[in-house]
C-alpha cells in the first residue's frame, strides 16, 4: 500500500478516535498505532467495524520485552483488512502488573495468542476466558522470552529410563569451560602449529 494511502488512513483514524490514539507512525510501508491500555478494546472494535477500515482479521498478537523501560512490555496486535487490502499494527505498553483487556470479545481468535503472550512473557489479560500456559509445562517456572530469563532455564526436563517417567532436575552444566584455539591451520593461516606439518609429496 502506498505511503499516501496509509497517511490518509492514519489521518482518518486519528480524526475519528481522537485521544484514543497516542501516536501514529508510518515506517517501512506499515502503519502503527500506539494506544493506551484503557482504549484498546474501543480502538480494536472501531478498526473492525468501521466501513473505511474493516480490519476483520486478527493475524497475530505478540509481546516484546524492553526491561530498561518502566512499562517493559509492548503487546502488539497485527490486523488485516482483506476488503481494503491493508495491514495495521496496534501497540499497547504494559508492565508485570498491568491488566491488558482481552481482545477475545472483539476477535475470538485472540484466545490462544493471548495465552501464548502470557506463557512466554507473563503479560496478564483481564477478561480472558482461559488464561493459562499453552506452550510450556504446567509446573514451568518463569517466562522464557523475557530478557532476564536465563538461557539454560531453571530446570532440566528429561525422561528417566529407570523410573519410567519424565523427571525435573536442576540444570547442571556437565561440561567445564573450555578455551578453544580458533587459530586453526585449516582456516588459511600462514603459519604451522607444531605437530600439524604436512608430509611433502614431491
From Swiss-Prot:
GO terms for molecular function: NADH dehydrogenase (ubiquinone) activity; NADH:ubiquinone reductase (non-electrogenic) activity; quinone binding. The keyword Repeat does not apply. SUPFAM superfamilies: Nqo5-like. Gene3D superfamilies: NADH:ubiquinone oxidoreductase, 30kDa subunit (3.30.460.80). Its main location: membrane. It holds the Pfam family Complex1_30kDa. PROSITE patterns: COMPLEX1_30K. It catalyses: a quinone + NADH + 5 H(+)(in) = a quinol + NAD(+) + 4 H(+)(out). One of its GO terms (cellular component) is plasma membrane. Its EC number is 7.1.1.-. Belongs to the complex I 30 kDa subunit family. NDH-1 is composed of 14 different subunits. Subunits NuoB, C, D, E, F, and G constitute the peripheral sector of the complex. This is NADH-quinone oxidoreductase subunit C. It comes from Brucella canis (strain ATCC 23365 / NCTC 10854 / RM-666).
